[in-house]
Amino acid sequence: MIDVLKPPPSSGLIREVRFFLEFPRLMLRFPDLARQPRGRGEPILILPGYGAGDGSTIVLKSYLRLLGYRARGWGLGRNSGNVRDLLPRVLKKMASFARRAQQEVHLIGWSLGGYLAREVARERPDLVRQVITLGTPVVGGPKYTVVARAFHRQGIDVDAIEAEIELRNQISFHTPVTAIYSRKDAVVSWEACIDRDAANVEHIEVRTTHLGFGFSPEVYKIIAKRLAVEADSLRHGLASNSPQRREATPTRRRH
């Protein structure tokens, strides 16, 4: 399967400017979004994508706070893409957040931030309630993204990164994951966002660009509903992977 994957063509990047269209859509849909189920201070940590920082997720964070969640950015500056350096730092941040909140943390990760969120859940499933990823490549790392060419020019071995990720993916984890992806994504190959092995992953397709994930009203509504399901399960004392919780989760959308 991996052999047939390719990064999106550079010519498609012009489509990413359409993410500006998400702002008027967000305003038009805001009355409906504001009526989504409310949280009760449940902790949410939002991880930005490669090259981005907390400023890129400020709109999403503000929306989740409006709904009553304790949402915060990761506080680690710009995402350098150095997973080996970032993962222990994110783990420390998340563990501290969970300890102060005295409950499991919901993780939302955009692109590479989603990969980090999955790895945090793999390392500390006891502290993570759920993971929501936005346009996150789960196979190949940067290999099936438009930044692959830049990595090649820098002498970075993307094949070695892919092999390392394959090994990591063999370590199973049971934290529920909602993987939101788009065939209109011109940065990450949408096929690379599909986890074909893990039973704990639900894939949901949306119509937005890669840059639009953080501002799409469709994405916001999905996130709000997923948070509500897990928050309600927690209030009723259900484990995140319990049969009752799975029954309450909306049917997965086929890809």
Set out the residue ranges of the language-model regions.
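Flexible, membrane-associating and regulatory peripheral segments of lipid-active enzymes
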Residues: 1-44, 57, 62, 67, ...
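Serine-dependent carboxylesterase/thioesterase catalytic core
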Residues: 40-59, 63-78, 83-175, 180, ...
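Catalytic histidine neighborhood in serine/cysteine hydrolases
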Residues: 70-72, 198-213, 223
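Catalytic histidine-centered segment of alpha/beta-hydrolase-like enzymes
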Residues: 81-83, 210-218
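Post-His helix in hydrolase/transferase enzymes
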Residues: 87, 215-227
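C-terminal alpha-helix
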Residues: 93, 97, 222-233
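Conserved strand-to-loop "acid loop" that flanks and positions the catalytic carboxylate
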Residues: 173-186, 206-208
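Conserved alpha/beta-hydrolase "acid-adjacent" motif
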Residues: 186-192
